[in-house]
Amino acid sequence: MQYSEIMIRYGELSTKGKNRMRFINKLRNNISDVLSIYPQVKVTADRDRAHAYLNGADYTAVAESLKQVFGIQNFSPVYKVEKSVEVLKSAVQEIMRDIYKEGMTFKISSKRSDHNFELDSRELNQTLGGAVFEAIPNVQVQMKSPDINLQVEIREEAAYLSYETIRGAGGLPVGTSGKGMLMLSGGIDSPVAGYLALKRGVDIEAVHFASPPYTSPGALKKAQDLTRKLTKFGGNIQFIEVPFTEIQEEIKAKAPEAYLMTLTRRFMMRITDRIREVRNGLVIINGESLGQVASQTLESMKAINAVTNTPIIRPVVTMDKLEIIDIAQEIDTFDISIQPFEDCCTIFAPDRPKTNPKIKNAEQYEARMDVEGLVERAVAGIMITEITPQAEKDEVDDLIDNLL
């Protein structure tokens, strides 16, 4: 027998009261986006559960994708059969023969939304249990915590059988907590920060700063690939490429070396905040971890934060590097993050960055530059690409292929 659909149960949505259907509709759309790589799969949702109809798609692959989607508590693969007692008896016998191993216990759990069906739930449990005994005479029934709980549901259109429950990712559906702008470099930390924001329902847009010719097409592609890895948790993500060469050259020419990193981060924060305002975001998210590098001190964060009143979320701020790496490996971003392409934060990095920069000094050095003009030109030059779970070969891929 082949699975016909996957029955999906919701996570924290049960606590959302009058907003429940808004959360459910968002989750349905997210599931549809993530499963868009399987065109034949169709997704529906109601107040109690969602259904992914396989229509011939490979169950194992679809299930692996579903495991990542935030907002799902658990799900079960389901067999759809004709709504008749004889067909049901034959189906439970076939299923039990496939999965039963010596010494296992079982029970039948039936329920029906079609109350015109010829047997009630108790009678159906007894009838189907008897069919199992016919197929496997020595099998034992156990009502509490059996090895196999074969669930049977009688609906108006058909009967459905399942025996397996698979844990989902939990969390909230992406997009139900508002939008945030993720400052995405090419490193290990920022994709993990994005992942943790997604888990709490934040719809992220990835802001990446590129400084050609100092940063390569490979660095840009790396950031896009990291973004694509994050789409599996809630669907498509807008990737915003910011031209940053002019600003970095200006900082390099007009500021002392010790303040290069501080000023660079202040400009990045200004630009990200301007993009957030235009695109109706609520927060800025980054991958800073306290004390991990010389520029990520509380004094440095204070100096960088000073250019905006927008809330800054730093999901990994209290984590050790090894904790962050563990998550990066779990979400499959680590191997991409360690590819040897330099990003904006490393190309002009000073040997001894200021660990306790003063806001007054930063403002004094910025007074030598046309800050507003630099920010406006950078924002005017952004390029936005929608990143989907399905990778498409693009010009950067072709360029890298030629270089290799």
Curated annotation (Swiss-Prot):
PROSITE patterns: THUMP (PS51165). Its main location: cytoplasm. Residues 60-165 form the THUMP domain. It catalyses: [ThiI sulfur-carrier protein]-S-sulfanyl-L-cysteine + a uridine in tRNA + 2 reduced [2Fe-2S]-[ferredoxin] + ATP + H(+) = [ThiI sulfur-carrier protein]-L-cysteine + a 4-thiouridine in tRNA + 2 oxidized [2Fe-2S]-[ferredoxin] + AMP + diphosphate; [ThiS sulfur-carrier protein]-C-terminal Gly-Gly-AMP + S-sulfanyl-L-cysteinyl-[cysteine desulfurase] + AH2 = [ThiS sulfur-carrier protein]-C-terminal-Gly-aminoethanethioate + L-cysteinyl-[cysteine desulfurase] + A + AMP + 2 H(+). Keywords: ATP-binding, Cytoplasm, Nucleotide-binding, RNA-binding, Thiamine biosynthesis, Transferase, tRNA-binding. The keyword ATP-binding applies. It is found in: Cytoplasm. Pathway: Cofactor biosynthesis; thiamine diphosphate biosynthesis. GO terms for molecular function: ATP binding; CCA tRNA nucleotidyltransferase activity; tRNA binding; tRNA-uracil-4 sulfurtransferase activity. This is Probable tRNA sulfurtransferase. HAMAP family: ThiI. It comes from Streptococcus pneumoniae (strain 70585). Catalyzes the ATP-dependent transfer of a sulfur to tRNA to produce 4-thiouridine in position 8 of tRNAs, which functions as a near-UV photosensor. Also catalyzes the transfer of sulfur to the sulfur carrier protein ThiS, forming ThiS-thiocarboxylate. This is a step in the synthesis of thiazole, in the thiamine biosynthesis pathway. The sulfur is donated as persulfide by IscS. One of its GO terms (cellular component) is cytosol. It comes from the Bacteria. GO terms for biological process: thiamine biosynthetic process; thiamine diphosphate biosynthetic process; thiazole biosynthetic process; tRNA 4-thiouridine biosynthesis. The keyword Transmembrane helix does not apply. CDD domains: PPase_ThiI, THUMP_ThiI. InterPro entries: Rossmann-like_a/b/a_fold (IPR014729), ThiI_AANH (IPR020536), ThiI_fer (IPR054173), ThiI_N (IPR049961), THUMP_dom (IPR004114), THUMP_ThiI (IPR049962), tRNA_STrfase (IPR003720), tRNA_sulfurtransferase_ThiI (IPR050102). Its EC number is 2.8.1.4. ATP binds at residues 183-184, 208-209, 265, 287, 296.
